[in-house]
Every structure is written in structure tokens, then in C-alpha cells.
A protein has these predicted regions:
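Absolute protein N-terminus
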Residues: 1, 22-23
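Bacterial N-terminal signal peptides that target proteins for export
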Residues: 1-8
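Hydrophobic helical h-region of N-terminal Sec-dependent signal peptides
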Residues: 8-16
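N-terminal secretory/targeting leader peptides
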Residues: 9, 23-116, 129-343
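Sec/Tat signal peptide C-region and signal peptidase I cleavage site
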Residues: 16-22
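Core domains of carbohydrate- and sulfate-ester-processing enzymes
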Residues: 121-122
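Basic phosphate/pyrophosphate-binding loop/patch that engages nucleotide-derived ligands
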Residues: 126
């Protein structure tokens, strides 16, 4: 073989190899909780497995818990936007005032206690009110968790007055507004900081879901767990599962279609359902540990809901001052919730 022929052959082989391997994509997704908690167990890992299976192995999704790739939970959105990671789990509330329209879904007694139903509402609401806010990333799913529960040292909450003076961790601005209105001292912090804050006495307890209680060792760090009566959650929290926009748009069409097939309403409800599954497990584990499991009376729940309504009105006024139509946002969130009730 002449040198020129050899070079041409080698170049052709190289081009073929490059073309072949160019179709293989590894996506690094990051989150900030234990891999044993509900969302990674029942949504993230099955979602990653589905992507790999449907692509015949051409897409591999690697999941990194506990922010192992760097950064912190509050700046996860920016890590995705800037390409430091390919994708991840974002709680917009961890950056207060940056995504204010998302807070409508987090207001007191806004959603049902079904994470799946609430997540369907979240996806619908997101399409109308939040896609411009998230234009710098590619949103795969928008979802909520199950009902927020009050976990604390000492006896369970029985009356509204029992909140007075308690130092309670809150995950979002609406949640901390509610805790303050109830008489507690709210301390905002991301979930990874909660166990240490409990163990050091920085907080007396906090509000979070049942499903997070095992991985946070709340069976050891708290004594009681209190929910409100009825079908509506005390509060909820909004999440997105998102990709770097350039990474998504740079994928071959057929592989991007696989991401699309596992996105949207289906993926959002899947993520919410993961929290429902985890909530049942977490509640049972707290009960098995001997902790006190309590539900407020309907009368006390009504008193707390009345305080929650005042918080919602205060939020509407704040949004109006920022140039939004706060009442319209609340009405839209309520409509999305009502439209997605499954019963």
C-alpha cells in the first residue's frame, strides 16, 4: 500500500471511529441528598436506567449525590446553566426572590397531600409561568414532594400555640413566612444542613417530608412528627430536574428524542410519585422507631389554615409590589391543583 493510500485509509477509519463514538453520551447529573432517599431511589435512578435502556446503552446517566461534583445546593441551577455539570436536581426556593412565581405552589395549604397530583399541577403551572425564568437550562420535569411534616424534639404539636418560640428549619420563603406567622422562629437552610443543626441544638426541629426522615436520621434526632388534618398539605416545595441547554441541544436527534420521551408531565408525575412511595416508607420507619406520630385536630388545623391564608395575602401584596399580579398567580396555582386531582 502506497503511503498516500495508507494515509487515506487511516483517515477514513479515524472518521468512522469518531462518528461511531460521537453517538455515545455520558451525562453527569448531580443532587444534594442521600442516594437512599426517595427521589434518587424511585425516580432518578429508574429514570437514568430507562434512558440507558431505551438508547441501547448509547446514553449513560451518572448520578452524583451529596453535591460530589462541587458547588452547593443553592447554586445548583447555575452549575447546570454554566455547564459545570450536565444536569441535576434544583430547588428554586434555595435562591430566595430569584424565581418568585414558583412560590405560588409553595404557599400554605396550596396542594393536596399527593406528591403525584401536586407534581402534575406543577408541570402545568410551569409551562405558563416559569419557562421564561428557566430559559437558560432545559427543563425535564417540574415536581413537588408530598406533605410537609413538623418534626421536632419533645412532644408533638397539639395546638397553634405550641409553635411559639420554637426554632424550626424551613426550606423556602413561603414556609418560613408561615412558621413565623405561627409564632416560631424560622431558620432557612438547605436540607443537607438540617441534621447537624438538630444535633447541635441550632434548631428544635423543622418542616420536611416523611420520605427524608430516615436518611436524615430523624428517628434519632427528633421525637415527634406532626401533620395537619385533611387532604391539603401544610406546605409543599417545588423542584426541577434539568439539563444544561447546550448539552441537550448538542445531542444527536435520536438521542435527544429519548430524553424528550422521558420528560414533561410523565416525568414530573413520576418524580412526585417517588416522594409518595418514600413518604409511606419514612412514616412507617419513624413509627417503628417508637417516635410519636400525630395529626392535629380538624379545629386546630382550621386555625393554622387561617394563619396560612393571611400568609398568602401577605405574599400577594409582596408580589404586587414587585410588579406581578399576585392574586392571579395564586388563582393559577389553585386552578392547576384543582385540574390535576385524581379522585
Amino acid at each position: 500500500m502506497h503511503l498516500k493510500e495508507y494515509a487515506a485509509c487511516a483517515a477514513a477509519i479515524s472518521m468512522f471511529a469518531t462518528a461511531g463514538f460521537a453517538q455515545e453520551v455520558t451525562l453527569r447529573f448531580q443532587h444534594f441528598v442521600s442516594p437512599a432517599s426517595a427521589n434518587p431511589t424511585y425516580f432518578m435512578q429508574p429514570w437514568a436506567d430507562a434512558i440507558e435502556e431505551q438508547s441501547n446503552g448509547r446514553i449513560k446517566v451518572e448520578l452524583y449525590p451529596f453535591m460530589q461534583l462541587g458547588g452547593s445546593a443553592p447554586n445548583q441551577f447555575d452549575l447546570i446553566r454554566d455547564g459545570a455539570i450536565d444536569g441535576g436536581w434544583v430547588i428554586p426556593a434555595y435562591q430566595p426572590n430569584r424565581f418568585p412565581e414558583a412560590e405560588a405552589l409553595e404557599l400554605p395549604f396550596m396542594t393536596s397531600k399527593s406528591g403525584e397530583e401536586a407534581s402534575a399541577a406543577a408541570w402545568d403551572y410551569t409551562q405558563t409561568y416559569l419557562m421564561d425564568d428557566f430559559a437558560d437550562v432545559h427543563v425535564i420535569a417540574a415536581h413537588m414532594h408530598g406533605p410537609g411534616i413538623v418534626h421536632k424534639r419533645g412532644p408533638a404539636i397539639e395546638t397553634l400555640e405550641d409553635f411559639e418560640g420554637l426554632k424550626l428549619r424551613g426550606p423556602s420563603r413561603p414556609a418560613t413566612m408561615l412558621l413565623e406567622a405561627l409564632g416560631a422562629t424560622p431558620i432557612g437552610m438547605p436540607v443537607p444542613q438540617f441534621p447537624e443543626a438538630l444535633s447541635k441544638g441550632v434548631v428544635d426541629g423543622g418542616v420536611i417530608t416523611w420520605e427524608m426522615s430516615p436518611s436524615l436520621k430523624l428517628d434519632e434526632l427528633t421525637d415527634s412528627h406532626t401533620d395537619v388534618a385533611g387532604d391539603q398539605a401544610l406546605y409543599n416545595l417545588y423542584f426541577i430536574w434539568a439539563m444544561n441547554k447546550d448539552v441537550y441541544e448538542g445531542m444527536p436527534d435520536d438521542l435527544r428524542a429519548i430524553i424528550d420521551a422521558n420528560s414533561g408531565m410523565m416525568a414530573s408525575m413520576w418524580a412526585g410519585r417517588a416522594h409518595d412511595t418514600g413518604d409511606a416508607v419514612g412514616r412507617d420507619l419513624m413509627a417503628a422507631a417508637g417516635n410519636e406520630i400525630a395529626t392535629l385536630s380538624e379545629a386546630e388545623t382550621a386555625r393554622i389554615a387561617a394563619v396560612g391564608a393571611e400568609v398568602t395575602q401577605a405574599w400577594i401584596a409582596e408580589m404586587n409590589d414587585k410588579g406581578f399580579d399576585g392574586a392571579a398567580l395564586v388563582a393559577a396555582a389553585q386552578a392547576a391543583v384543582a385540574d390535576n386531582l385524581m379522585q
